[in-house]
């Protein structure tokens, strides 16, 4: 460089290109043979200043690290210089560590011998300080090498007036040719005054930082060897995004002189060129240093085998050669060259060792470069000599990179771990770097230089790693690193904190981490230490007793109660028991959403439930297909660990400002009720919830119209005698479900297939025959009772001719197990109808009950809350004056008959009528067409009318209170009736006819009480019910066909699709599209 450019770099105000926003700082410290720093320079590239400046920090470094009194033995033997690390987290420095055991001048001279002999006079002129001039010296291979030696400037004012420049330090700018050939003996490099790259050459390492801000360039070497130092050079870089120390170093054999490594945003490195070298890839698939320096890897047999099998394929080949030593005696000598070979315990543990000691020392030996051990035997330490002497009988003797590990557990429960590492000069395929801050200090004896390394973590725990730099290290060029881990209370937690803080980019698998041995002393026996530790069980699933030469270690499961109390530190020998958090199906809690207070309901729903419901509704499948779909999608709804993936969490919140504080919580609770997710703790509150909602909304002047929408409807229409009442179980025997179908077809599918009138009412929540009292409104037992009590007494064979055990002829297909449809129906019923605490809010129990015997003008129910609910529910066409009656409140055809009527007794007589009836489907509209003869009808048939009653809504005009238009059911038949008319001629008066109820909700208006009562009365008077003989069969009294049940069961779906028969032969049909409150105005009802 010329003096002008040096001056520019020396100015802190000098700014680089604005695009360079990821700057670093480099610290170079060089020490001579005395106790002073020869040259210290920081290349600071600050993120804010975006400039480069050179500063000398000699005194600052000296004071910080207390560098002094380097033993004279080193000076007598040889000179040594190295660069030391100073890492400042705030500034994000790049730090380069160089340790050399030869004088800089000698190293440079030796390195250049293979290229060109350097004149000693020129070598003497080499100035280590930054010079104002640049001399280009041409070498044999065409390299332009920039040194600052021809015109040395010893005036250090340009850099630092206190600097003593006795070690070499070079700066040059380098551009690289893209067509560089890695196979040539010499590199192709042109060094010129280019602004593209700024490279710093120190000893045998040249680090380039380009203006590209994310590229570190490894420049060419003057000598053809690895550019890393022969001992243990380490490059530590910090990434701007994470501002944490990153370790990017590896010891590798470099075949190319112009390798490039790209630094990405995550602090990882990717090789851009020359695939033949092993370098750190972008996945950083290397061994985590913690596995060597911190954890007790190899302590136990199974864990050691597992670990070694995991690391055998590491690119750096550590672990490819494994030999275990006990007391400096080799135990195994297998040479593992095949990467696919799985290590077995017999490869490095003999039988005797298994019995005596599992906790032992071992070596990880690298076998990449094989040489004759005799050439280097004298250069090894005494300990290594002994090891290699034992291994001399191997077929291939190598000079190896080794890592020696020794773990001791002291009586005070401290883990003492010693690690020795030897990196051979010719083999750079090992990874062992401490990503750390290092401070120089002296031990007590003063005969050994030590670096004390601190790992600072979030919990302020410190790991002290001692790196030895003994005299033997430098004399024998071994570069050993001795590390001892002291005072570690929780190794695993500390290591995890280091990784979480991104102090290491090398990441290890969780499988390679091992827990700490937490030990306690046995007072009765000082030689026994009791520890808790997770280990693998043997084949017999018995805990392994681990024994060492020093102590016996007893596993956690073998500790007695007193030992466990002492181990866990629990007073009075009362151990804590962790309460397992029980998952609940739903919960209600308060949250703040966008600054507003809300009550949120949270529940779990089956993942595929919505898809099932949508599929059933859109496809309009028949009953058999729906049952088949539900059975295939059946999932256990009990929340546990096994079926948790079958559920997904949903939530909904209600603002206090909109609904009010009390109502917001109640509405949230309604969400849980809707999705069958009320926890046990909220059941009592759910009982009160219905009453409060009705009180606050139905009777409140300030109530919102939102209360009538959606799933709140069934609660608003329920009276106080609903299933949420605290007296529910007492009322089950006194109340009958009336309005079963408060849901659409797909939701009530199972309910509609239930045998609602079976006698086991007490078990499933329905009426028990035992407590039922038959009521008649007139003497003959028929009168105005469209549905009388006799339909509940199914077991009375005298009344129910179709359920007669003697003639074996029955219309109850529910119990016909020979049919697959019926089997599935029974299974679904059993799931749905079990009435207990777990499903007390079952859909089958969303009912609308009323207790008043009948409603008339003299007893208006509009003034009673219970009847108000009923009257609002004007689409319910139940007979008003029938106590405990049953009716369906959706647009469906209900076929009900009394088994006590003369109609049953005349079954044989009416058989011909049944044969003339046909059921068929046209455009999804089921029509009943038939021609019944002019035979008189008696009894229950008094309420059947003459013709199709589908003209009522047309005659009533637009003000029709019941504009039912979604589905029409027509009965084209002439039926003579004795009631309510006095003659046999059926009138055609529209007032006495009605459409078979097909629910719609377009423009329905209910303006006052009178209209409600009148509409109910009209609906009651014109209610059409009929007995269904839809399946022709030979079943008759005294004429029994054994196959008749199967025949009827098979024909039921085809002849009357979507219908359901119970024991009383009552047929149910539903329409899923009915919305009772759509467009309906109920605001004018006087309460």
Swiss-Prot record:
Keywords: Chromosome, DNA-binding, Nucleus, Transcription, Transcription regulation. GO terms for molecular function: DNA binding. GO terms for cellular component: chromosome; nucleus. It comes from the Eukaryota. The keyword Transcription regulation applies. It is found in: Nucleus; Chromosome. GO terms for biological process: development of symbiont in host; DNA-templated transcription. Disruption phenotype: Asexual blood stage is normal. Female and male gametocytes are formed but fail to develop into mature ookinetes. Zygote development is arrested at the ookinete retort stage; however, meiotic replication proceeds normally. In the zygote, transcription of several genes is affected. Infection of mosquitos with knockout parasites results in a lack of oocyst formation. Disulfide bonds: none annotated. Its main location: nucleus. Residues 586-682 bind DNA. The AP2 domain contains a non-canonical linker peptide between the second and third sheets. Belongs to the AP2/ERF transcription factor family. AP2 subfamily. Transcription factor which binds the 5'-[TC][AC]TG[AT]AC[AG]-3' motif. During the mosquito vector stage, plays an essential role in the zygote for de novo transcription of genes required for ookinete formation. This is Transcription factor AP2-Z. It comes from Plasmodium berghei (strain Anka).
């Amino acid at each position: 460089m010329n003096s002008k450019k040096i001056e520019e770099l020396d100015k802190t105000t000098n700014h680089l290109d604005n695009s360079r926003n990821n700057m670093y700082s480099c610290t170079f410290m060089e020490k001579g043979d005395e106790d002073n720093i020869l040259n210290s320079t920081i290349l600071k590239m600050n993120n804010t200043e975006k400039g480069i400046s050179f500063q000398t920090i000699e005194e600052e470094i000296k004071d910080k690290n207390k560098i002094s009194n380097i033993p004279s033995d080193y000076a007598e033997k040889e000179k040594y210089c190295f660069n030391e690390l100073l890492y400042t987290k705030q500034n994000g420095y790049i730090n380069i560590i160089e340790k050399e055991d030869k004088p800089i001048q000698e190293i440079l001279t030796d390195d250049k011998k293979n290229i060109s002999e350097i004149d000693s006079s020129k070598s003497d002129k080499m100035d280590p300080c930054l010079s104002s001039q640049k001399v280009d010296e041409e070498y044999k291979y065409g390299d332009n090498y920039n040194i600052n030696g021809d015109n040395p400037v010893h005036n250090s004012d340009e850099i630092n007036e206190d600097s003593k420049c006795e070690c070499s330090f070079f700066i040059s700018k380098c551009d690289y040719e893209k067509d560089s050939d890695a196979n040539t003996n010499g590199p192709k490099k042109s060094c010129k005054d280019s602004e593209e790259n700024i490279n710093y050459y120190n000893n045998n390492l040249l680090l380039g930082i380009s203006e590209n801000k994310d590229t570190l360039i490894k420049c060419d070497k003057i000598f053809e060897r690895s550019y890393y130092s022969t001992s243990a050079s380490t490059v530590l870089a910090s990434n701007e995004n994470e501002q944490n120390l990153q370790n990017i170093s590896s010891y590798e054999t470099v075949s190319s002189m112009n390798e490039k490594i790209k630094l990405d945003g995550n602090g990882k490195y990717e090789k851009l060129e020359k695939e033949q070298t092993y370098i750190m890839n972008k996945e950083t698939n290397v061994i985590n240093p913690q596995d060597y320096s911190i954890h007790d890897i190899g302590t136990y047999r199974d864990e050691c085998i597992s670990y070694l099998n995991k690391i055998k394929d590491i690119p750096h080949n550590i672990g490819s050669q494994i030999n275990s030593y006990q007391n400096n005696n080799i135990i195994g000598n297998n040479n593992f060259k095949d990467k696919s070979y799985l290590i077995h315990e017999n490869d490095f543990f003999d039988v005797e060792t298994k019995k005596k000691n599992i906790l032992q020392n071992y070596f990880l030996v690298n076998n990449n470069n094989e040489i004759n051990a005799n050439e280097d035997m004298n250069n090894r330490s005494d300990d290594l000599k002994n090891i290699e002497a034992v291994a001399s009988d191997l077929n291939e003797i190598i000079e190896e990179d080794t890592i020696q590990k020794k773990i001791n557990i002291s009586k005070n429960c401290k883990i003492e771990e010693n690690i020795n590492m030897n990196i051979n000069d010719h083999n750079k395929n090992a990874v062992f770097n401490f990503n750390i801050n290092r401070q120089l200090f002296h031990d007590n004896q003063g005969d050994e230089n030590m670096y004390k390394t601190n790992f600072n973590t979030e919990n302020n725990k410190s790991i002290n790693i001692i790196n030895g730099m003994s005299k033997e290290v430098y004399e024998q060029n071994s570069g050993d690193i001795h590390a001892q881990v002291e005072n570690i209370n929780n190794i695993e937690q500390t290591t995890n904190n280091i990784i979480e803080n991104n102090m290491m980019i090398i990441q290890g698998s969780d499988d390679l981490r091992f827990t700490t041995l937490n030990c306690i002393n046995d007072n009765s026996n000082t030689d026994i230490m009791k520890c808790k530790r997770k280990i693998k069980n043997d084949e017999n699933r018995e805990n392994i007793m681990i024994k060492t030469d020093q102590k016996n270690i007893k596993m956690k499961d073998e500790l007695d109660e007193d030992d466990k109390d002492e181990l866990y530190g629990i007073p009075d020998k009362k151990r804590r028991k962790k309460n397992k958090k029980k998952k609940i199906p739903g919960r209600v809690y308060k949250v703040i959403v966008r600054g507003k207070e809300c009550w949120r309901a949270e529940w779990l729903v089956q993942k595929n439930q919505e898809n099932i419901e949508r599929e059933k509704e859109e496809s309009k499948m028949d009953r058999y297909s729906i049952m088949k779909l539900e059975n295939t999608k059946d999932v256990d709804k009990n929340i546990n660990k096994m079926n948790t993936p079958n559920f997904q969490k949903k939530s909904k919140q209600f603002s206090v400002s909109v609904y009010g504080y009390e109502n917001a919580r109640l509405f949230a609770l309604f969400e849980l009720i809707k999705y069958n997710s009320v926890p046990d703790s909220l059941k009592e509150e759910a009982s009160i919830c219905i009453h409060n909602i009705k009180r606050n909304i139905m009777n409140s002047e300030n109530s919102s119209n939102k209360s009538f929408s959606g799933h709140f409807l069934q609660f608003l229409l329920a009276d106080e005698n609903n299933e949420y009442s605290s007296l529910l179980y007492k009322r089950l025997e006194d109340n009958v479900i009336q309005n079963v179908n408060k849901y659409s077809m797909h939701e009530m599918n199972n309910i509609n297939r239930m045998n609602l009138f079976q006698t086991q009412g007490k078990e499933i929540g329905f009426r028990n025959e035992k407590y039922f009292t038959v009521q008649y409104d007139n003497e003959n037992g028929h009168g105005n009772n469209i549905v009388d009590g006799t339909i509940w007494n199914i077991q009375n064979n005298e009344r129910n001719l179709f359920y007669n055990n003697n003639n074996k002829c029955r219309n109850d297909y529910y119990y016909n197990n020979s049919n697959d449809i019926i089997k599935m129906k029974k299974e679904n019923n059993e799931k749905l109808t079990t009435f207990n605490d777990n499903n007390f809010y079952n859909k089958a129990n969303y009912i609308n009950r009323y207790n008043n015997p009948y409603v008339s003008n003299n007893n208006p129910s509009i003034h009673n809350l219970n009847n108000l609910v009923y009257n609002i529910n004007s689409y319910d066409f139940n007979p008003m004056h029938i106590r405990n009656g049953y009716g369906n409140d959706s647009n469906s055809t209900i076929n009900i008959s009394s088994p006590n009527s003369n109609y049953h007794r005349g079954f044989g007589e009416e058989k011909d009528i049944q044969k003339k009836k046909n059921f068929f489907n046209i455009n999804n509209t089921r029509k009943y067409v038939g021609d019944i003869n002019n035979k008189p009808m008696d009894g229950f048939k008094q309420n059947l009318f003459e013709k199709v009653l589908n003209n009522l809504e047309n005659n009533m005009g637009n003000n029709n209170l019941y504009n039912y238009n979604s589905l029409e059911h027509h009965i084209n038949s002439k039926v003579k009736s004795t009631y309510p008319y006095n003659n046999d001629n059926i009138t055609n008066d529209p007032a006495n006819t009605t459409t078979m109820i097909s629910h719609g909700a377009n423009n329905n208006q209910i303006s006052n009480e009178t209209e409600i009562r009148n509409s109910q009365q009209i609906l009651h008077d014109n209610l059409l019910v009929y007995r269904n003989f839809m399946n022709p069969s030979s079943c008759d009294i005294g004429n029994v066909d054994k196959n008749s049940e199967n025949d009827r069961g098979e024909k039921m779906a085809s002849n009357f699709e979507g219908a359901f028969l119970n024991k009383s032969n009552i047929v149910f049909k539903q329409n899923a599209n009915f919305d009772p409150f759509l467009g309906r105005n109920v605001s004018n009802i006087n309460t």
